[in-house]
Swiss-Prot record:
It holds the Pfam family Rnf-Nqr. Its main location: membrane. This is Ion-translocating oxidoreductase complex subunit A. It comes from the Bacteria. The gene is rnfA. InterPro entries: Ion_transpt_RnfA/RsxA, NqrDE/RnfAE, NqrDE/RnfAE_oxidrdctase. It comes from Shewanella denitrificans (strain OS217 / ATCC BAA-1090 / DSM 15013).
Amino acid sequence: MTEYLLLLIGTVLVNNFVLVKFLGLCPFMGVSSKLASAIGMSMATTFVLTLASVLSFLTNEFLLQPFSLEYLRTMSFILVIAVVVQFTEMLVQKTSASLHRALGIYLPLITTNCAVLGVALLNINEDHNFIESAIYGFGAAVGFSMVLILFSAMRERLAAADVPLPFRGGAIAMITAGLMSLAFMGFAGLIK
C-alpha cells in the first residue's frame, strides 16, 4: 500500500509530466489563458489519461505480448487513445455543450497529447502491473491538472498586471512556467 502511495505522490509532484518530463506542453500553453477552460481540460485529460493508461496496459498484456506483437505497441496505444478521446468528446458534448465549445480544438487534440502516449509507454517500460498502471496514469493526470490550473490562475493574474511590453503574452508565460518548474524541483528529495 505504501509503494502505491509513493508512486502516486512521485508521479504528481516529483516527476510531474509537464514541469519535469516536459510532456503535454501544447495544452499546457494553449488552454491555460482562462481558468474555466483549464479546469474543463483538466477533467477531460484526467479521464482520458487514467482510462488510456489502464486500457493500454490491458492491450499490451492480453493482445500484444501473447501474440508477440510488441512492435505494434506505439500504433496500438495511439489507437486506444484515439478511441478513448472520441468517447470523451462525445461524453463532454452531451453533458456540457458550453465546455465543449470552450475547449474547442483542444479536446480532440488530447489524441496527440504526448503526455497520454508517454504515460502508456512508460507504464510498459517501467514494468508496472495493472494497479500500478492505473495509479501512474491517475497520478500523471492529477499532476497535469494541478499544474494546468495553477498556471492558468497565474496567467489570469498576469493578464491584469502591468507587464512590460516585451514580456507580454508568450514571453511572460514561458518565464512563469520556468519558475513553476523550479518550484517543483523542490520536491526532488521527497521520494527516494
